[in-house]
Structure formats: structure tokens, C-alpha cells
């Protein structure tokens, strides 16, 4: 798992790891609560997990785990379906090694930890109309057009399960039925939390994510750069500068 500043895979796994233990950056009122026994326990778990990692994860970005898995350097990582899709595409062109990887691999949902409920963090790509738009109604009409079944179903199929849907009706899309290795992915929109965790969704949550507050805290412990206490203290100070 990436310990470098991997905005997708790195942020995804550390948020799951922390949330699954009951650790949160802020509470429902956006008050910083990262300095907690749950965070300390989560960091102990992350450190133990990182001791099993291959060398180099401290500098991994979002591409490194794909490469490592496809080259059989690792047998477990967190990702969307891009690794599987790459192996499948290469296998279709006659790559025997890629076919071996494709046939042998599978996907799983994130485990539920002591928190007792799914605490996954999947990346959301929002559709937004900016206030400065000169044609807001046209933008809204396009969004409505895109989400109509005759348009969205085709788009969803072409995304080959890399992207999932926010509307229940699209559970019936063929992409979730044609390949058993992709079927469980249709539920990720139901299972994911937002970047704010317990807190609100907005600029502050986005800033904490962009500044890698949680990821850097985990990485500093896993790499031995900081003790658990010191790492939590740094994250707490960073968070309080953002949430004020």
C-alpha cells in the first residue's frame, strides 16, 4: 500500500485504516478529534501492516502498486479495477504473463474493523455547475441528459467498472453481471464515506485531504520518522489550522 503522497490509493487506504478503528480527524461539528486512543490503536495497526510491505512504498505514487502487482512483486494491494483491466487488455493481445495475473486475481470489499460498519473511502468525481457559468440551465440539462438510462448505461459499461453509479436503478447494468470478478463493485457508492468522515463535506475537508494530513501521519509512523504520539500531534496541529 502506498505511503507516498498518492492522492488516490494512498489517501484511500489510510482513511479506511483509521476510520475502521474508530479514529476520525473531526467530529460531526467539525471539531478536531484526531488525538484519541482510537487513532493510536489505528497507527499501531498500520505500522504492523507496513512491516509486511515490499521495499519502496514510502515513495509510491498511484501508479507504483499497479506496476508491482502486474509484475507479481506483490499479491495484495488497494486499487480500483485498473490493474485487472490492464491485465485483461494485455491478455487479449496475447500476453501470457498478463493472462496468468488476470486469471489468478480477484477483488474484495474492504474489511469491516472494530468500528462495526463499512468505512471505505472511494474517490468521487462530482458533476458541478459553477456559479459564474453563463449557461447554468444548459449545464443542468446536460447533467440530466447524462444520467438518463439510454446515455448513462452505455457510459457505465464503457468504464468497465472503474467507475460506479450513484443511482440505484443502475444496479441492473450489464457490467455488474458479465464478469463475476467485478460484481461486488456495484455497491461501493453505498459503502463509501466522504472525505470529511464524520464531519462536513467542503473546503476544509478537501484541504485536509489535499494536504495529506492523514496520509502523512500514517507514513511518518510506518517509516519510523516519528513516534505515534508525535505523529498525532503534527496531524492535530495541521487540522486545527484548517478547521478554524
Tell what function each PLM region has.
Residues 1-32, 38, 74:
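Extracytoplasmic/periplasmic solute-binding protein
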Residues 29-58, 106, 110:
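Glycine-centered hinge/linker elements that transmit conformational signals in sensory
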Residues 57-71:
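Short helix-initiation/N-cap motifs at beta->coil->alpha
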Residues 62, 79-84, 125:
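Beta->alpha turn/N-cap motifs
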Residues 71-80:
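Alpha-to-beta junction loops
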Residues 81-99:
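A ligand-binding cleft/hinge motif common to bilobed small-molecule-binding domains
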Residues 103-109, 157-213, 218-220:
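Long, aromatic- and glycine/proline-rich binding clefts that accommodate carbohydrate-like moieties
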Residues 122-135:
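A bilobed periplasmic-binding-protein/Venus flytrap-type ligand-binding module shared by bacterial periplasmic
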Amino acid at each position: 500500500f502506498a505511503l507516498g503522497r498518492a492522492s488516490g490509493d494512498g489517501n484511500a487506504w489510510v482513511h479506511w485504516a483509521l476510520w475502521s478503528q474508530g479514529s476520525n480527524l473531526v467530529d460531526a461539528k467539525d471539531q478536531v478529534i484526531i488525538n484519541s486512543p482510537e487513532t493510536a490503536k489505528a497507527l499501531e495497526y498500520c505500522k504492523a501492516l507496513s512491516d509486511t510491505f515490499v521495499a519502496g512504498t514510502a515513495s509510491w505514487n498511484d501508479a507504483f502498486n499497479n506496476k508491482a502487482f502486474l509484475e507479481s512483486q506483490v499479491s495484495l494491494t488497494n486499487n480500483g479495477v485498473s490493474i485487472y483491466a490492464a491485465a485483461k487488455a494485455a491478455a487479449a493481445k496475447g500476453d501470457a504473463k498478463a493472462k496468468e495475473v488476470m486469471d489468478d486475481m480477484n477483488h474484495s470489499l474492504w474489511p469491516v474493523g472494530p468500528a462495526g460498519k463499512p468505512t471505505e473511502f472511494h474517490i468521487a468525481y462530482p458533476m458541478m455547475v459553477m456559479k459564474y457559468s453563463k449557461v447554468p440551465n444548459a449545464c443542468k440539462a446536460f447533467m440530466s441528459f447524462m444520467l438518463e438510462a439510454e446515455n448513462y448505461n452505455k457510459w457505465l459499461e464503457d468504464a468497465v467498472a472503474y467507475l460506479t453509479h450513484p443511482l440505484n436503478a443502475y444496479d441492473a447494468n450489464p457490467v455488474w453481471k458479465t464478469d463475476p470478478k467485478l460484481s461486488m463493485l456495484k455497491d461501493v457508492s453505498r459503502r463509501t464515506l466522504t472525505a470529511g468522515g464524520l464531519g462536513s463535506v467542503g473546503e476544509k475537508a478537501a484541504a485536509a485531504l489535499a494536504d495529506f494530513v492523514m496520509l502523512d501521519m500514517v507514513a511518518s509512523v510506518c517509516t519510523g520518522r516519528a513516534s505515534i504520539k508525535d505523529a498525532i500531534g503534527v496531524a492535530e496541529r495541521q487540522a486545527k489550522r484548517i478547521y478554524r
